Amino acid sequence: MAALNGLVLLLLTISAMFISECYSSGESQSIQRKGQCEEVTCHRTLNHLGVAVTSGCPSGCLCVISAPDSAVNVNGTCYQLMGSTSTTTSSTPSSEDQE
């Protein structure tokens, strides 16, 4: 019985170590920047109405700022947004529709 308890404890420990390794390796990987957003810095400032606005990222990029929402006059980094492929279909009227 003691051997069975030891085996269960060993399996639980190995499982916990494996899960911990999976989560820690995922957190250490950074987001890859590429294309038009690479090496681009964006800014959050106040406009003439006192509203916080972001600027500086090209079209198709997202400005990510690692500061609280209440902070203004801070810099961020531009990241490429994921694109999606959309398909459109068009139909031509048949001879039956025209009559």
Swiss-Prot record:
Disulfide bonds join 37-61, 42-63, 57-78. One of its GO terms (molecular function) is toxin activity. The keyword Signal applies. Coiled coil: none annotated. It is found in: Secreted. One of its GO terms (cellular component) is extracellular region. Expressed in salivary glands. Residues 1-24 form the signal peptide. Keywords: Complement system impairing toxin, Disulfide bond, Secreted, Signal, Toxin. The keyword Signal applies. It comes from the Eukaryota. Belongs to the RaCI family. Complement inhibitor. Prevents complement-mediated C5 activation by binding to C5. Binds C5 at a different binding site than the other tick complement inhibitors OmCI and CirpT1, and the drug eculizumab. This is Complement inhibitor RaCI7. It comes from Dermacentor andersoni (Rocky mountain wood tick).
